[in-house]
Curated annotation (Swiss-Prot):
<feature type="domain" description="HTH asnC-type">
    <location>
        <begin position="2"/>
        <end position="63"/>
    </location>
</feature>
<dbReference type="InterPro" id="IPR019887">
    <property type="entry name" value="Tscrpt_reg_AsnC/Lrp_C"/>
</dbReference>
<dbReference type="Pfam" id="PF13412">
    <property type="entry name" value="HTH_24"/>
</dbReference>
<dbReference type="InterPro" id="IPR050684">
    <property type="entry name" value="HTH-Siroheme_Decarb"/>
</dbReference>
<dbReference type="InterPro" id="IPR011008">
    <property type="entry name" value="Dimeric_a/b-barrel"/>
</dbReference>
<dbReference type="InterPro" id="IPR011991">
    <property type="entry name" value="ArsR-like_HTH"/>
</dbReference>
<dbReference type="InterPro" id="IPR019885">
    <property type="entry name" value="Tscrpt_reg_HTH_AsnC-type_CS"/>
</dbReference>
<dbReference type="InterPro" id="IPR036388">
    <property type="entry name" value="WH-like_DNA-bd_sf"/>
</dbReference>
<comment type="subunit">
    <text>Homooctamer; tetramer of dimers.</text>
</comment>
<keyword id="KW-0805">Transcription regulation</keyword>
<dbReference type="Pfam" id="PF01037">
    <property type="entry name" value="AsnC_trans_reg"/>
</dbReference>
<keyword id="KW-0804">Transcription</keyword>
<protein>
    <recommendedName>
        <fullName>HTH-type transcriptional regulator LrpA</fullName>
    </recommendedName>
</protein>
<dbReference type="InterPro" id="IPR000485">
    <property type="entry name" value="AsnC-type_HTH_dom"/>
</dbReference>
<keyword id="KW-0678">Repressor</keyword>
<keyword id="KW-0238">DNA-binding</keyword>
<dbReference type="InterPro" id="IPR019888">
    <property type="entry name" value="Tscrpt_reg_AsnC-like"/>
</dbReference>
Amino acid sequence: MIDERDKIILEILSKDARTPFTEIAKKLGISETAVRKRVKALEEKGIIEGYTIRINPKKLGYSLVTITGVDTRPEKLFEVAEKLKEFEFVRELYLSSGDHMIMAVIWARDGEDLADIISNKIGKIDGVTKVCPAIILEKLK
């Protein structure tokens, strides 16, 4: 298990993975070396799997972001998922329970682009039975 300090380290790094260890150490009242050791231990335990960046899709010309549910014939689920992984416009992809079998985060330039993605790309994959996009209006957290 992890202790309260580790939880704080994870919270800080999840907001900004580039936060200097010296800054984290000051917030926790411990040495930079202690922070470094804790982060290394969190990495070795597989709690920290990697470091990434957040991209603003609008700054790259993608005015629409959707969370899109995709349903398939059961025997085609994994084939469809593999095909979806190949598309650049699919930014994240999840197998899920609930309303849809697959959930995809999709970036589209505009409504026309989204319609093309849904009808001519995802909708034409063998085994896809339903595509249900929900346009993200505002990211809250």
